[in-house]
């Protein structure tokens, strides 16, 4: 009987060495799925002295992979009723440990982490946090092969053009 228990223990230990959670593999697959253009809505919610307040805008993200875990891209947030009111910025991104980190090239904007997200070939939704504000940002996007970036990117500088890159914003998105 003792030999049977020893054999079972050795078999279980052997099986455990062959099973593992490959976080790197999952991150690579998420980065591969993320590549392309995603369009939808971004919602910001916060509490002010009158209660819950917020705003909702159309948004589009473009993700280009440079390595297995990340790359570069750009984002535009705009008012669907007035597309000339928009915010456009380029960024670097990386998938690490199940989160997506976005670092905006414009240093006036803080980096964000996308967490608690759901991503498949057709839909991408989740939450963003910059670590500073009490604002809750939720987004819901669909994969979009036909989005026309021309309106927003024609006046944009190329990524890495200078250390003084600034986002482009007009109308209600312009900083005062």
Where does each model-flagged region fall?
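Bacterial Sec-dependent N-terminal signal peptides
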Residues: 3, 14-41, 164-176
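Small side chains
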Residues: 9, 36, 40, 71-73, ...
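N-terminal leader/targeting signatures
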Residues: 3, 14, 57-59, 120, ...
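Tryptophan-anchored aromatic micro-motifs
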Residues: 30-56, 91
């Amino acid at each position: 009987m003792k030999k049977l228990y020893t054999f079972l223990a050795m078999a279980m230990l052997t099986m455990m060495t062959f099973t593992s959670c490959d976080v790197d593999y999952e991150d690579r697959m998420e980065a591969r799925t993320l590549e392309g253009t995603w369009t939808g809505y971004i919602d910001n919610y916060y509490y002010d002295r009158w209660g819950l307040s917020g705003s909702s805008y159309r948004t589009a993200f473009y993700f280009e992979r440079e390595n297995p875990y990340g790359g570069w891209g750009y984002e535009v947030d705009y008012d669907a009723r007035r597309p000339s009111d928009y915010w456009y910025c380029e960024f670097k991104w990386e998938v690490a440990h199940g989160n997506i980190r976005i670092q905006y090239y414009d240093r006036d904007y803080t980096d964000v982490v996308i967490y608690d997200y759901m991503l498949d070939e057709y839909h991408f939704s989740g939450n963003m946090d910059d670590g500073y504000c009490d604002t809750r940002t939720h987004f819901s996007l669909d994969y979009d092969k036909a989005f026309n970036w021309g309106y927003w990117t024609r006046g944009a500088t190329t990524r890495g053009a200078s250390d003084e890159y600034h986002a482009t914003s007009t109308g209600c998105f312009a900083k005062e």
